[in-house]
Amino acid sequence: MSVSAFNRRWAAVILEALTRHGVRHVCIAPGSRSTPLTLAAAENPAFIHHTHFDERGLGHLALGLAKVSQQPVAVIVTSGTAVANLYPALIEAGLTGEKLILLTADRPPELIDCGANQAIRQAGMFSSHPSQTLSLPRPTQDIPARWLVSTIDNALAMLHAGALHINCPFAEPLYGDMNDTGLVWQQRLGDWWQDEKPWLREARRLASDKQRDWFFWRQKRGVVVAGRMSAEEGKKVAQWAQTLGWPLIGDVLSQTGQPLPCADLWLGNAKAVTELQQAQIVVQLGSSLTGKRLLQWQATCEPEEYWVIDNIEGRLDPAHHRGRRLIAKIADWLEMHPAEKRKPWCVEIPRLAELAWQRVVAQRDTFGEAQLAHRIRDYLPEQGQLFVGNSLVVRLIDALSQLPAGYPVYSNRGASGIDGLLSTAAGVQRASAKSTLAIVGDLSALYDLNALALLRQVSAPFVLIVVNNNGGQIFSLLPTPQSKRERFYLMPQNVHFDHAAAMFNLRYHRPENWEELESALAGAWRTPATTVIELVVNDTDGAQTLQQLLAQVSHL
């Protein structure tokens, strides 16, 4: 009997089972213990393979692929700390709903807790963060193949959103020629190998029912808050709110077109807050709200009813309003709850939104970080997509820009970390094959610098704008101690990114004005390659401009 041959047959059943649940992308890191899984994936023609030497980046690459494809993505890593490096992406997926299937190779049980090399306690190591966990036994012909495939099917059927961790122990030897070992065991699955359906099909219904009193609430004064959603959903939500005559407060990730732009500015005006107090119902579609003023208003508003609609399970209202938590796809929910044509009830808010926009436009000529955020819609590639980093840049775009309705926007706004942003953006581009504009800060770029290796081969133009304000300037917006701010919060690195781009053979520009930036972008969009554009800006100008605009708009 060949242990290595049966390991591969066992792994082949696992990987084939994944294809029946829509898995097409498989992300693979190098490793020896994962050989059975890697070879099974490599030999399965249903998969598109992605490789990366850094497991943390690999997990985020899978996250980006899942964001766009809306299908589960598999990740294969070897044993030991390689598994631990998947933790950040796993956490993010749990908060934003992307389906990741983490196939982690492991030592067999007799090598755990006895000093064996590269052997750690992997089973259950992610605690409560995976949506589902599955610890498989060591491959053995004593367990029928139908148990293995039905167990995988059951776990995937239960996976509504987030990550599934499948821990896969394999004994040595891991290498060797294939022979007939386990062939009969494998063939007992019969014509399943030629079929395209799961062995075990389970129906699971999570969608909320139609709210029978909607006809009553849609006649009231309402407010629509739009969080993270798809481009198509964003357009539908904007039309729905317009028909109802309800003000729409759109997040940067809502893709609604933000018909009342600069919400995070005008929500700091007492007149706007007073008018919003008249709302009898607030309907929040989507989660992961960005704006500080929006979150402050959301925490203090007291409508008669506060509804939260999202396809993700769990509580999504940190203010704990009285109301309803409805689990449904946003597009489906809108169809079940049609709008009734009514006149807008807000007067002050549209006026304030227009005045706030004019204040932002008045400052657009200065070459700086805040102005880039305002101008970003002018630089979006046609028929393309935008990936927005975290920290200061996403807040500036949320507060100062107005992105087109239905234009795809992606970000990691679940745990809102700055780790893995370049890797996630790479996954977003690979899954869509669209021209992509990504914008991150300098510390975010440094954090995931080796992900530039993933950007060496792209299928469409990819532009990475690194806003270099020399440190974590988000802390300039917070009451951090002035004497400790630079060393312990901002942590300026005094670096530029030309050498990093050169190391990975990427095109590079460092424009010093808007004309040079526009020229660099024009060239970049003509070539299916990655271009790094570094904008070196005054360190505190972005935060100061935002604070100045907040003060101005609050007194309108």
UniProtKB/Swiss-Prot annotation:
Coiled-coil intervals: none
InterPro entries cross-referenced by the UniProt entry: MenaQ_synth_MenD (IPR004433), MenD_middle (IPR032264), THDP-binding (IPR029061), Thiamin_PyroP_enz_TPP-bd_dom (IPR012001), TPP_enzyme_TPP-bd (IPR011766)
Alphabetically ordered keywords of this record: Magnesium, Manganese, Menaquinone biosynthesis, Metal-binding, Thiamine pyrophosphate, Transferase
GO annotation terms (biological process): menaquinone biosynthetic process
EC number per UniProt: 2.2.1.9
Entry note: cofactor: Binds 1 thiamine pyrophosphate per subunit.
GO molecular function: 2-succinyl-5-enolpyruvyl-6-hydroxy-3-cyclohexene-1-carboxylic-acid synthase activity; magnesium ion binding; manganese ion binding; thiamine pyrophosphate binding
Catalytic reaction list: isochorismate + 2-oxoglutarate + H(+) = 5-enolpyruvoyl-6-hydroxy-2-succinyl-cyclohex-3-ene-1-carboxylate + CO2
Cysteine-cysteine disulfides: none
Similarity annotation: Belongs to the TPP enzyme family. MenD subfamily.
Assembly: Homodimer.
Function field: Catalyzes the thiamine diphosphate-dependent decarboxylation of 2-oxoglutarate and the subsequent addition of the resulting succinic semialdehyde-thiamine pyrophosphate anion to isochorismate to yield 2-succinyl-5-enolpyruvyl-6-hydroxy-3-cyclohexene-1-carboxylate (SEPHCHC).
Name of the protein this chain belongs to: 2-succinyl-5-enolpyruvyl-6-hydroxy-3-cyclohexene-1-carboxylate synthase
Organism the protein comes from: Salmonella schwarzengrund (strain CVM19633)
